[in-house]
């Protein structure tokens, strides 16, 4: 047995260099074996990896190493999501060019990622800011343009007059730009959009085929697409109250059954009817201007106070010409949804109820819960949105809500106004086309030219890529491409006249919406994909990333795959067969006496029984241990991966990341847990060496028979192999590690039993036991190799004397006969309460099990001398006795 400690600092870089020297993780596209594509969401090159990256990439690496050992042709690439605003901010703040800042960061982060020991094919490395990548993105933009999947349209946008850029709704906070603090203006601008709505129904339907995606992710996408069936109703307007002879107001509703509960109409501030009414109404114009300064994120609108302005316009109820409904401009109605107008039924919609309570419009309940007396059913502060029977609804009274919807639809479809039906059935989607225009320098240029004679002219493909100029300055707000003295000035490729380039660049979500396809053949200079290779390697078998990307990134990637199929670049619809969203790495917080935050490195933790006490290392002052939260620089509860790897080694960090929690849940970082992982690594090293020593005298050939001790050990080894294999395939990594720990204990026990005399030489062991100990050590090394690959390589060659690399070894074959249990232990309940356990032969029949159960003293005592009335046996699960 070796007394030498395992030295991770020496071993890890040595094995990483050997993997690189032999290029063992490089994937060949012409490999005839079945492929397996595992991919983690590629990182933004911010300059440093964080501990969350270590977890994310370790999860994928375990899968990649396991599937490679199972004989698959594994594709496990890495690249950089390299365009984006932080590079421009760095240019402004640090006076460094975005390109230089980005590539410096890539160099630093690549070194860090290599130190984790990831089995990546670095030969396929891509950076989205590389013209060799984005020239193909520009080509696909032109393909989409020809196919009607990209177009230019006027859109209402949020304009930051200080930063001089368009802001997403989520970037407007209390009516101000999130970065500049300037009051945001609502403008109409020409924007490039991708027509994702052409695939609305298809994107929705296909969610049902993604059975290896988390249910919560599919639900989030389903809600974002937002399919709803309803009626488009044309409300007539009272001509005496409307401006410019406006005659009707169209609304889309999913609840036509509640029409008799209507108390008001509401339109968006930028609805054409609102704009027309405001021309001669300064107060209304002021209210609309105020609405335009509020936040436009849906979450902010939902929580803001509901405000409205009565336009004086009156809409006529479609079932009662004498029933006039006031038309309000309301701050909670968005022009982008439906028709930008609603009818308000306050009794059955909380938002509408809050509104009418504010303005004293009252409410009329029209759906009464089953069993409730309609005469006593009233609504005050809480709307009722459940099922029931119709009341206060004339010809609908007594119907179910569904029957009432159908009746309203039939009646209004049958009525006409101006040769058009008053209502028609419609399917509406919440999903809107994807606006990709960004007024930023550091992004993929949009390959079009604006000519005063020819309008919009695509850049000829022979002139791609349209590259970014490097001699730009950031000394004034706005897009540096607009300010460049020469870059945007070109000749029109169609007429030869003077023209200008498009200075908007693409949303960075475009860059990450197809990178997975480029990885299949990043060397193809003439096309975005090599179709035959892409169709063979895609879809990605296992995609891994944070749930924060559950909607936009995944939805845009699903659209892009379909658009690439429509333009001949791919042959499939879905990009990711399996999707896994890992939890975050969190850490407790520490607050100093002065109210500031202390980092974990500044704090000493002392444990006294169940109590933990924290003090500052430098002063000894007490520190308040706060809540466990997401790691953030502001609260200084971050952990530097370099420090952990430098102190303990990458394998320790990898093991800890996998062992503490199920991978879809948050893992709480603790120094004690990391130290425990480091101790276990040393234990494995000692255990493998001891087992290897004990197995040195083992015969080359498998013994014909095995004694009891050898057979027990072999069953433990193959049972662990089976459970770890299943655990990795099910992504139950923490369970795998628990099984490895359990098997390590069983191997240690077997070694202890084999030493009847501690000084006895290994050659004195029985051949079957010696062979079984060596087999067990080999299996142990192989099942922990996906998690601790460096330690596994060291054990494989130095301790076990194996040739080659464990990273290239085939996964051990499970012997099914060794998985058959000789006996099973079943819990025993009497009258629903557990009273004990019974161990019986695994092939025991019900009579034998019943006899063994009734012989238990605990069962006899629970029955109190009475006969059991019934014994229920759930095979291999539980025995229930009814007394």
From Swiss-Prot:
Keywords, comma-separated and alphabetical: Aminoacyl-tRNA synthetase, ATP-binding, Cytoplasm, Ligase, Nucleotide-binding, Protein biosynthesis
Matching InterPro entries: aa-tRNA-synth_I_CS, aa-tRNA-synth_Ia, Leu-tRNA-ligase, Leu_tRNA-synth_edit, M/V/L/I-tRNA-synth_anticd-bd, Methionyl/Leucyl_tRNA_Synth, Rossmann-like_a/b/a_fold, tRNAsynth_Ia_anticodon-bd
Record motif 'HIGH' region, residues: 43-53
Main location (coarse class): cytoplasm
UniProt catalytic activity: tRNA(Leu) + L-leucine + ATP = L-leucyl-tRNA(Leu) + AMP + diphosphate
Group of enzyme by EC: ligase
Cited PROSITE patterns: AA_TRNA_LIGASE_I
Keyword check for Membrane: no
Compartment(s) where it occurs, according to its Swiss-Prot or TrEMBL record: Cytoplasm
Domain of life of the native organism: Bacteria
Binding site for ATP: 633
Pfam families, alphabetized: Anticodon_1, tRNA-synt_1, tRNA-synt_1_2, tRNA-synt_1g
Motif range ('KMSKS' region): 630-634
Protein name: Leucine--tRNA ligase
Protein species of origin: Nitrobacter winogradskyi (strain ATCC 25391 / DSM 10237 / CIP 104748 / NCIMB 11846 / Nb-255)
């Amino acid at each position: 047995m070796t007394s030498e400690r395992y030295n991770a600092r020496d071993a890890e870089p040595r094995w990483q260099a050997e993997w690189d020297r032999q290029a063992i993780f490089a994937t060949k596209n012409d490999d005839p074996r079945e492929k397996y594509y595992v991919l983690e969401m590629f990182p933004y090159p911010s300059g440093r990896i964080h501990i969350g990256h270590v977890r994310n990439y370790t999860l994928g690496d375990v899968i990649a190493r396991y599937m490679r050992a199972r004989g698959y042709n594994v594709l496990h690439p890495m690249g950089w999501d390299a365009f984006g605003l932080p590079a421009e901010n760095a240019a402004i703040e640090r006076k460094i060019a975005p390109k230089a800042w980005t590539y410096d960061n890539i160099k630093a982060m690549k070194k860090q990622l290599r130190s984790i020991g990831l089995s990546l094919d670095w030969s396929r490395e891509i950076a989205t800011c590389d013209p060799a990548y984005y020239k193909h993105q520009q080509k696909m933009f032109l393909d989409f343009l020809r196919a009607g999947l990209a177009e230019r349209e006027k859109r209402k946008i949020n304009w930051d007059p200080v930063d001089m850029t368009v802001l997403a709704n989520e970037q407007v906070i209390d009516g101000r730009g999130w970065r500049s603090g300037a009051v945001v203006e609502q403008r109409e601008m020409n924007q490039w959009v991708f027509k994702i709505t052409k695939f609305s129904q298809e994107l929705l339907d296909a969610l049902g085929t993604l059975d290896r995606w988390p249910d919560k992710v599919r639900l989030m996408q389903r809600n974002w697409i937002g399919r709803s069936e309803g009626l488009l109703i044309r409300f007539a307007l009272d001509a005496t109250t409307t401006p410019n002879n406006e005659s009707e107001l169209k609304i889309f509703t999913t609840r036509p059954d509640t029409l008799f509960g209507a108390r008001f109409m509401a339109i968006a501030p930028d609805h054409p009817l609102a704009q027309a009414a405001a021309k001669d109404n300064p107060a209304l114009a002021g209210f609309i201007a105020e609405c335009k300064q509020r936040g436009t994120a849906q979450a902010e609108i939902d929580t803001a106070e509901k405000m409205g302005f009565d336009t004086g316009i009156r809409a006529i109820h479609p079932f009662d010409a004498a029933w006039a409904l006031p038309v309000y401009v309301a701050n909670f109605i968005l022009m982008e949804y439906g028709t930008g107008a609603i009818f308000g039924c306050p009794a059955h919609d909380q938002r509408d109820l809050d509104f009418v309570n504010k303005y004293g419009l009252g409410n009329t309940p029209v759906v009464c819960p089953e069993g409730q007396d309609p005469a006593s059913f009233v609504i005050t502060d809480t709307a009722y949105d459940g099922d029931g029977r119709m009341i206060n609804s004339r010809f609908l009274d007594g119907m179910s809500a569904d029957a009432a919807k159908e009746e309203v639809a039939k009646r209004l479809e049958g009525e006409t106004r101006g040769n058009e039906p008053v209502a028609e059935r419609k399917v509406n989607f919440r999903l809107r086309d994807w606006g990709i225009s960004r007024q930023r320098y550091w992004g993929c240029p949009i390959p079009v030219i604006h000519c005063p004679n020819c309008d919009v002219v695509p850049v000829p493909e022979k002139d791609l890529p349209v590259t970014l100029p490097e001699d730009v300055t950031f000394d004034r707000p706005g897009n540096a491409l607009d300010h460049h003295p020469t870059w945007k000035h070109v000749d029109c490729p169609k007429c030869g006249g003077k023209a200008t380039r498009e200075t908007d660049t693409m949303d960075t979500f475009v860059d990450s919406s197809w990178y997975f396809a480029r990885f299949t053949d990043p060397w193809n200079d003439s096309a975005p994909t090599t179709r035959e290779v892409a169709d063979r390697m895609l879809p990605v078998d296992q995609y891994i990333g944070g749930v924060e990307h559950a909607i936009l990134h995944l939805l845009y990637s699903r659209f892009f795959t379909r658009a690439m199929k429509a333009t001949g670049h791919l042959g499939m619809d879905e990009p990711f067969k399996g999707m896994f969203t890992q939890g975050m790495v969190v850490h407790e917080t520490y607050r100093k006496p002065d109210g500031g935050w202390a980092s974990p490195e500044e704090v000493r933790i002392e444990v006294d029984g169940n109590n933990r006490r924290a003090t500052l290392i430098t002063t000894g002052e007490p520190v308040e241990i706060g809540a466990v939260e997401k790691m953030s620089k502001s609260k200084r509860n971050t952990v530097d991966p370099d420090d952990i790897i430098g102190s303990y080694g990458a394998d320790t960090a990898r093991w800890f990341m996998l062992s503490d929690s199920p991978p879809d849940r948050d893992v709480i970082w603790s120094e004690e847990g990391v130290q425990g992982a480091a101790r276990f690594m040393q234990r494995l090293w000692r255990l493998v060496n001891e087992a290897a020593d004990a197995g040195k005298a083992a015969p080359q050939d498998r013994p014909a028979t095995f004694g009891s001790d050898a057979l027990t050990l072999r069953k433990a080894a193959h049972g662990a192999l089976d459970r770890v294999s299943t655990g990795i395939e099910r992504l139950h990594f923490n369970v795998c590690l628990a099984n490895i720990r359990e098997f390590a204990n069983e191997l240690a026990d077997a070694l202890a039993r084999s030493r009847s005399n501690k000084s006895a030489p290994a050659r004195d062991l029985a051949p079957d036991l010696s062979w079984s100990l060596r087999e067990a050590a080999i299996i142990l090394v192989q099942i922990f190799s996906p998690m601790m690959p460096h330690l596994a390589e060291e054990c494989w060659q130095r301790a076990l004397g194996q040739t080659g690399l464990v990273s290239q070894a085939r996964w051990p074959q499970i012997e099914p006969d060794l998985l058959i249990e000789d006996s099973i232990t079943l819990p025993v309940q009497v009258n629903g309460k557990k009273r004990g356990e019974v161990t019986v032969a695994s092939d025991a029949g019900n009579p034998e099990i019943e006899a063994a159960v009734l012989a238990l003293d605990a069962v006899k005592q629970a029955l109190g001398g009475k006969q059991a009335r019934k014994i229920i046996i759930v095979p291999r699960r539980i025995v229930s006795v009814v007394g």
